[in-house]
């Protein structure tokens, strides 16, 4: 799928299966471009989306 490469400033951190579920901060991604299974979170801790 084609995804824009822009950073979603609403995303504070993400957690991915490939990182062993560790929190990854300072991410520059968006809901479309995130790796499969990665969960993207807002700064208040709510989940914004999961990569598909």
UniProtKB/Swiss-Prot annotation:
The keyword Transport does not apply. Disulfide bonds join 3-32, 7-28, 16-38, 31-49. One of its GO terms (molecular function) is serine-type endopeptidase inhibitor activity. Keywords: Disulfide bond, Protease inhibitor, Serine protease inhibitor. PANTHER family: PROTEINASE INHIBITOR PSI-1.2-LIKE (PTHR33832:SF16), SERINE-TYPE ENDOPEPTIDASE INHIBITOR (PTHR33832). Belongs to the protease inhibitor I20 (potato type II proteinase inhibitor) family. Potent inhibitor of trypsin and a weaker inhibitor of chymotrypsin. It does not inhibit elastase and subtilisin DY. This is Proteinase inhibitor PSI-1.2. It comes from Capsicum annuum.
